[in-house]
Structures are given as structure tokens and as C-alpha cells.
Amino acid sequence: MSRKCAVTGKGVQTGNNVSHANNKSRRRWLPNLQETSLLSDTLGRMVRLRLSTNGIRTIEHKGGLDAALLDIPDARLNQDARRVKKQIQKAIEAKKATA
């Protein structure tokens, strides 16, 4: 599993630690990723995604998992999030067809 947020795409960054004497040593900055379970109202079940804390805030700001995934373009989502988005879209279409 990659160290990338499923929603925001935030990942590992690299650079240098620079000392007072200007000595440089390579280092990595890891994103604050959390394995979260979020409720999908449309699917009626919990969905597990690996999200950054910023990604969790984005989902809450947009009004929940379903609204956020439908609003975010596919290019920004990882494979797991795209799969959930497609399931949500199919469930919405099925509800419209039966109604």
C-alpha cells in the first residue's frame, strides 16, 4: 500500500536536513495518513480508505463521503477511491431507475 492519500493525493516528500554548519543529509517527510472507516449513505455500509488528516477534513467539509467523492475529479482519486465512487454512482442510478 502506497503512502498516499486516497482523496488529496498527498504523498511522501524528500529533501535535506540542513545543519547550522550547512551540512546536508537526505530525509523524507511522511504524510499524516490514517486508516479510516467512513459511512457511505448511498451504499449503506462502512468504507475503509487511507486518508490524510487534510483529506478527512475535506470529506467532512463537502458533506460526507458520497458528496466528496462525487465532487472530486477521478484524476485526483486513487484506485480504491475511484472504485468506491463508481459503486456510489451505480447505486444512485439504480435508485433513480426504480423510483
Curated annotation (Swiss-Prot):
Residues 11-22 have a biased composition (Polar residues). Residues 1-25 are annotated as: Disordered. GO terms for cellular component: ribonucleoprotein complex; ribosome. Pfam families: Ribosomal_L28 (PF00830). SUPFAM superfamilies: L28p-like (SSF143800). GO terms for molecular function: structural constituent of ribosome. GO terms for biological process: translation. Keywords: Ribonucleoprotein, Ribosomal protein. It comes from the Bacteria. Belongs to the bacterial ribosomal protein bL28 family. This is Large ribosomal subunit protein bL28. It comes from Rhodospirillum centenum (strain ATCC 51521 / SW). The gene is rpmB.
